[in-house]
Amino acid sequence: MSALEKSMHLGRLPSRPPLPGSGGSQSGAKMRMGPGRKRDFTPVPWSQYFESMEDVEVENETGKDTFRVYKSGSEGPVLLLLHGGGHSALSWAVFTAAIISRVQCRIVALDLRSHGETKVKNSEDLSAETMAKDVGNVVEAMYGDLPPPVMLIGHSMGGAIAVHTAAANLVPSLLGLCMIDVVEGTAMDALNSMQNFLRGRPKTFKSLENAIEWSVKSGQIRNLESARVSMVGQVKQCEGITSPESSKSIVEGIIEEEEEDEEGSESVNKRKKEDDMETKKDHPYTWRIELAKTEKYWDGWFRGLSNLFLSCPIPKLLLLAGVDRLDKDLTIGQMQGKFQMQVLPQCGHAVHEDAPDKVAEAVATFLIRHRFAEPIGGFQCVFPGC
């Protein structure tokens, strides 16, 4: 493993592996928790951060797709927010509250296909081209032929899709572009170990609280406030799924049924039904999307991304969790002044969740600097040195 890949993994992957059974068990409840200290892992509704929610219908060749968006603000440019792989529009919740208080703008946070509450006919097609078209179609469905000024802001996979959307000119009123912690070089290096990372995650959780607790204690999201609203969009409640214990009981019951005579089979069937009922009471939660199955699209998201980003003829902003993430093309581009860059240290990969206020300040400063938006609430720009 190269030094570059090692340094990338330290910020991008969880800082330590989850404790055995932490996804849904109470084994990790005392981990590094002082006596009497207790944190609240209960989920928080989207309505505490966004003003409204809308399901946008889009017509295409396969029929009608429905894309979930969360909105805030009524004036100024539209900040169209695209989440990372496996996340949802709710990952932008805390950032939304922060940016709305700094500049006059409108927020549209979109659940990309196969993520969150978006429903599409062909949920297996996660190619960069298809998702970029989705973004353009949603803008057209919401605003018609005369869309307001739009700035695309994307994190990780969403950052790649934002660049593909901009490069294909699918949003005619696009005025700016922002990528958050996604760089072609480090992203391509990370793909080799991504399956191992995904296999290391818990497959199910006993409750939303357990999912939120795992996300924070594993380091996936370092900001508890964001995790309490964001994880709701990452997991779903399963109907009819069986836990390992219940599965074992059912299998043992089937074996026993084969060995029993007709008189005993009735009692075995009764036990099996009781096991099934007990399982349904648990209703474990699992991930909304199986990211491991999307592997064939990963290369298409990130290959050639740096040059594609540099080629977009609009003001550009790159926010990174560490300067070590820069690849050769972006390093040269940054030295030539082709985009604005800001490093936000002490963050994990989910920069906008870990440090929503800092990201909001960077985006607000970018908007004001280019005269795309007006400051509100006495917000003062602090221009970065890099």
UniProtKB/Swiss-Prot annotation:
MF annotations from Gene Ontology: lncRNA binding; protein C-terminal methylesterase activity; protein kinase binding; protein phosphatase 2A binding; protein phosphatase binding; protein phosphatase inhibitor activity; protein phosphatase regulator activity
Positions with biased composition (Acidic residues): 255-265
Positions bearing Omega-N-methylarginine: 16
Positions of post-translational Phosphoserine modification: 15
Pfam families xrefs: Abhydrolase_6 (PF12697)
SUPFAM superfamilies found in the cross-reference section: alpha/beta-Hydrolases
Subunit structure and binding partners: Binds PPP2CA and PPP2CB.
Highest taxon of the lineage: Eukaryota
Modifications after synthesis and translation: Phosphorylated by SIK1 following increases in intracellular sodium, leading to dissociation from the protein phosphatase 2A (PP2A) complex and subsequent dephosphorylation of sodium/potassium-transporting ATPase ATP1A1.
Compositional bias segments (type: Basic and acidic residues): 268-280
Catalytic site positions: 156, 349
Reported function: Demethylates proteins that have been reversibly carboxymethylated. Demethylates PPP2CB (in vitro) and PPP2CA. Binding to PPP2CA displaces the manganese ion and inactivates the enzyme.
Positions of post-translational Asymmetric dimethylarginine modification: 16
Record EC number: 3.1.1.89
Name of the protein in question: Protein phosphatase methylesterase 1
Family: Belongs to the AB hydrolase superfamily.
GO BP annotations, alphabetical order: regulation of sodium ion transport
Keyword tags: Hydrolase, Methylation, Phosphoprotein, Serine esterase
Region: Disordered, residue numbers: 1-38, 255-280
Catalytic activity: [phosphatase 2A protein]-C-terminal L-leucine methyl ester + H2O = [phosphatase 2A protein]-C-terminal L-leucine + methanol + H(+)
Keyword Phosphoprotein assigned: yes
EC top class, as a word: hydrolase
Annotated InterPro entries: AB_hydrolase_1 (IPR000073), AB_hydrolase_fold (IPR029058), PPase_methylesterase_euk (IPR016812)
